[in-house]
Amino acid sequence: MQKKHGITNMQKKHCITYIQSTFGNTIITLTDYNGNTKTWSSSGSVGFKGSRRSTNYAAQATAENAARVAIQLGFKFVEVRIKGLGYGKESSLRGLKLGGLIITKIRDVTPTPHNGCRPPKKRRV
């Protein structure tokens, strides 16, 4: 009997979702387990412009849009990797769940310096 090579049925329904949450926008990228990008969505592409892109509601709407497309592509389970310090971190998780995806794992991959470069000076307004 030959060994079966390729993707298992479980991996076909699984995807990795990267949420990049900045103070000005929220970008969500869906990839398969090999890292190939399947779809992406951002607050600007959903229809929010200017300062409305950085709101919690915009992040939730972006996540719901990405979840809708993921279900159309055949994904059901999602592993979430969150990066950034923006406002839409928790809202985007809520949006993925409202969109119909099942969240299996949540990882925070925000890069934190171990006392590396000096940060820029504070703004004086």
UniProtKB/Swiss-Prot annotation:
GO terms for molecular function: structural constituent of ribosome. Keywords: Mitochondrion, Ribonucleoprotein, Ribosomal protein. GO terms for biological process: translation. The keyword Mitochondrion applies. The keyword Ribonucleoprotein applies. Its main location: mitochondrion. It is found in: Mitochondrion. SUPFAM superfamilies: Translational machinery components. NCBIfam families: PRK05309.1. Belongs to the universal ribosomal protein uS11 family. This is Small ribosomal subunit protein uS11m. It comes from Marchantia polymorpha. The lineage of its organism: Eukaryota, Viridiplantae, Streptophyta, Embryophyta, Marchantiophyta.
